[in-house]
Amino acid sequence: MVASIRSGVLTLLHTACGAGILAMPYAFKPFGLIPGVIMIVLCGACAMQSLFIQARVAKYVPQGRASFSALTRLINPNLGIVFDLAIAIKCFGVGVSYMIVVGDLMPQIMSVWTRNAWLLNRNVQISLIMLFFVAPLSFLKKLNSLRYASMVAISSVAYLCVLVLLHYVAPSDEILRLKGRISYLLPPQSHDLNVLNTLPIFVFAYTCHHNMFSIINEQRSSRFEHVMKIPLIAISLALILYIAIGCAGYLTFGDNIIGNIIMLYPQAVSSTIGRIAIVLLVMLAFPLQCHPARASIHQILQHFAEENVSISATSADEPTVATESSPLIRDSSLDLNEVIEEESIYQPKETPLRGKSFIVITCSILVASYLVAISVSSLARVLAIVGATGSTSISFILPGLFGYKLIGTEHKTAVPLTTKIFKYTGLLLFIWGLIIMITCLTAALKLN
């Protein structure tokens, strides 16, 4: 099934707007209102340019077969497994955090209608949601199949946006009593919170790059002029949502804001619906994390399988020098074609990731996510470290590297100005990604 631009926009927007949208007002606390808005715009521009670069470099592999693995192997085959591992860890960690959110909110939601201790147990709620909703959606092979789920999730985000705006425009007396000091410029920095603590919220608010190649592969055309519309629309909408929720939430509570804004609203029908909306959002977002994680795990397993085959072939060819070189050259070229051809999730029509492999990897992700989610109530620090490494790698470092190394290589003489701009913007994104990785790791390790 060929995907449309609209379904691509919905999928990308849904991937970007996860549960982190609830923390956007909190991100303003050490920055102040105006610097906070500037950070949202700056990080949005960086994310959009990174997605544009992904759209540009997709042409360097056969149409419908673009992926991080295929492109990484064009630059340096040895780096492929490193970035596949980063994607798998990042997506798995975010998926687990979604289930932890379900475990935190579902008992609060159910308490409105029942006092049954079994139904108010967080592990029971995680089990039910995983079994009846998350697992079936995670077995879908194409992102386009999740377009209706994405529509529901985006509707949930829209409701949250309206809820935050309404409470800002017409606050209750209880909310007014919670209001703290508002800073329009940088406020005085405190020991327990500074800009490094909330910087990752801005930087990773637009992380959706791990699904960009899947979306490109499912489009009827991979031409840049066609594909660029998807990140342009999706990131623009995300930017509007983040500014609306971030500004309204911060102006409502000032420096008394907390990490999950909806927890500050008094018990009411509107806030209960808001909690349900959050559960819908994260529940439907889990498959969007499972999708690239599954592909990356498959690539890692395939890498080791190919390595074993290569070692066996080398051992078999050792007796003669004449047969030692030519088979290895042929194997090398075949390996590259196989890598591009076997992009599991990124090429659904000709994927080897089906049957037993597809089921085993998907079940492993689901079971591991479930076990971690019911065992741990907070992954804040771990996810901060995973985000600083995995998210930065796939959002800035790797796309930037692709852009700088690949864009313009098709030109033998003069390189057009537009191509040069994309090429060197890739280098800037690569450097930006390294700076952000170091900064956010410092924040996660020393300031939390």
UniProtKB/Swiss-Prot annotation:
Membrane-related topology note: Multi-pass membrane protein
Regions annotated as coiled coil: none
Swiss-Prot/TrEMBL GO biological process terms: amino acid transmembrane export from vacuole; amino acid transmembrane transport; transmembrane transport
Intervals, Vacuolar compartment: 29-32, 102-125, 172-195, 251-267, 379-381, 446-448
InterPro entries to which the protein is assigned, alphabetical: AA_transpt_TM
Subcellular location: Vacuole membrane
Family note: Belongs to the amino acid/polyamine transporter 2 family.
Protein name: Vacuolar amino acid transporter 6
